Amino acid sequence: MHVTLYKLGKIPIPPKLYGGTERYIYWLGQALIALGHRVTLIANAESHLPGAELRTLASDEKNPQAWLNLIPESTDIVHFHEQPRGPVSKPYLLTIHGNGRPGEQFPPNTVFVSRRHAANHGSRRFVYPGINPDDFRFSERREDYALFLAKASWKVKNLQGAAAAARRAGLELRVIGSRDWPLRLQRWLPRIRGVRYYGLLGRPEKEELLSRARCLIFPVRWEEPFGLAVTEALVSGAYVVATPYGSLPEIVTPETGRLSTRMVELAEAVKHPQQFSPAACRDRVLRGGFTHLDTARKYLDYYERILTRGSLGEDGEPAPATKPGFMAKHLLPWGNGA
C-alpha cells in the first residue's frame, strides 16, 4: 500500500528537540516501511524519514491550493495529522491529536488517540500513538529523582502539584522544559526548593534522564488525549504517578504506577518505589499495544476499511463532534493539601 503521511508545519519530522506529534508521525512512518509499505512524507523541508519520499512546499509558495499537488498520484490513502486545507480527491484518514472546541465537527474518517479521547468527541475509533522501544534506554537500576515532562506553561499540566508531591516524598524533581515557556516561568523554577530545571533538552539527554529516573510525575488537570511522555517513561523503566484523567487509566496499571487526584497519595507512591518493577513498566508498552508497530497495524486495518467501504462509519452514523459543553482546559479537581 502507498501511504502518504501529511503534517506541514514549522517543526520538522522527526523534531530536533520538542515535538511529540512529529516524533510519533516519524515512528509511524518507520513502522509502515518496516511492514513493507511505501510511504511519502509531506512535511517541513528539514524533515527526513529513511526509506520514504519527502515532499514539501516552497517557502515562498503563494498558491493556497499548492498542497494538493504534493500528494502523489500513486497514493492509495492520505493520512492527515491536521485538518485538510480543502477538499481531497484521494481517500484519506484524519488523526486528531488534541482536544476540540465544544461542538466542533470532524470528517467521518477521523480517528482519535485514546478510547476516552474518542468518546469526548462522539466516536469509538482510536489508535494509541505507539513509540519505537529501540529509541529508549532501559535499566533496572534507578536513581533517586522524579521527572516532570510536560508543557509546564499550561496550568492543566500542574507543575506545582508535581513539585509538591516530590517534595513531600523527599525526592528531587527534575523538570525538562519546552520551547514556549515564558521567561518568568524559567526564572521562577530554579527558586523552588527541590526542583532542578533543565530547560529544553535534545533526545539523547532526555532519554538518559528517563533511563535513570525513579518515576514520572504527571498530575494533569484536564482530559489528557494521550500523553506520550507516559509511555516514554514506562518503556524506559520508570513508573508513573498521575491523575486519573483522560487516557491515563488506559495506560497506567496498578503494576506500573498510581492514579489519584490527591497529592498525598501520589507522594506515597513516589516514596515507595519497591512496589513497582522497571521490567513490568517496560512490558506494559511492549505487550500493551503501545509500540509503533502496534499503531501501524491498527491504522492499516482502518486504511483497508476506507479503501474497501469508502468510510469508517456505519450507514447513518453521525460524524464525530466534540461534546457540547466540553471545555478542554477547564481545571479538573486536584487535592493539594494533606
Predicted regions and their residues:
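Nucleotide-activated donor-binding/catalytic signature segment of Leloir-type glycosyltransferases, i.e.
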Residues: 185-207
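A charged, aromatic-enriched C-terminal amphipathic alpha-helix characteristic of glycosyltransferases
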Residues: 61-62, 265, 272-328
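Conserved donor-binding/catalytic core segment of Leloir-type glycosyltransferases
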Residues: 124-129, 134-176, 288
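Conserved acidic donor-binding segment of nucleotide-sugar-dependent glycosyltransferases
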Residues: 253-264, 270-275
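A short hydrophobic beta-strand element within the catalytic core of glycosyltransferases
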Residues: 216-218
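Short hydrophobic beta-strand element within catalytic cores of glycosyltransferases
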Residues: 238-242
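N-terminal strand-loop element at the rim of the active site
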Residues: 9-16, 24-63
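Short alpha-helical segment that forms part of, or immediately flanks, the ligand-binding pocket
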Residues: 207, 230-235, 249-250
